Amino acid sequence: RAVRARATMSRTIWNVLNPNATAGGALTFASSLADANFVIGATGGDWQFQLKFSSGSMSCNMCWNVNERKENQIDLSLVTVDASNDINGIAMNDPVSGVADLALIKRLNQWKGGNYLTSGNQYPPLVISSERLMRLIVAEDALANGNVAAFEAQIDAIRALDGEVEFNSGGAVSDTAMLMHTRRMNLVLMGLRLGDMYRWGITDPMWHSASDAILTPGHMLPITIVEIRANCNLNGQGCAG
């Protein structure tokens, strides 16, 4: 049910992005709520549904590309790196406490095998769904329906998992800004960021001005030109013969 809640949430976001992505605030997730609430009630303890890897089974190609080959990197708005592109600090602060975000640190520690300052390997778990995601679904739906108290309660339940100070609605950080930040920090490396960027009108300074991401926001197949040219389903030449 946790995976289904993620899938129906993603479908709701997809429907907002297509045919044209428009910036907005919180969304209602009516098709996801029952599953999300069930998982929250049935789990706890910062539960995650993971794909696990090991030297005795199989490796994670994405993990290898980030941790070892470094073909892909953690965004530099989140971390700082040294001359070898190894993480040497946290760039993203929590908007309430003003110090390095604890949810981000916890996820990066997991990703690097215990300590985000180490190089890591090709075997960290991939998080497919989690208690945090379920609470984010419930929180956003509550905010979209004007139930600020329920939104705040879910956000603070997530923050409590890391020992963060409580968020108080109506303060210096707006509810929407808190939602956006909490999703970003708690869904790192889950493949959900691009949809959030599109629906909230966020762009990356690395995106080329003539890219599909800029010209036609909503594109969800961000692969390299080499891969496009090699794929007969994408290169415009067809697959016949």
Model region roles, listed by residue range:
Residues 150-161:
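Active/binding-pocket-proximal capping segment
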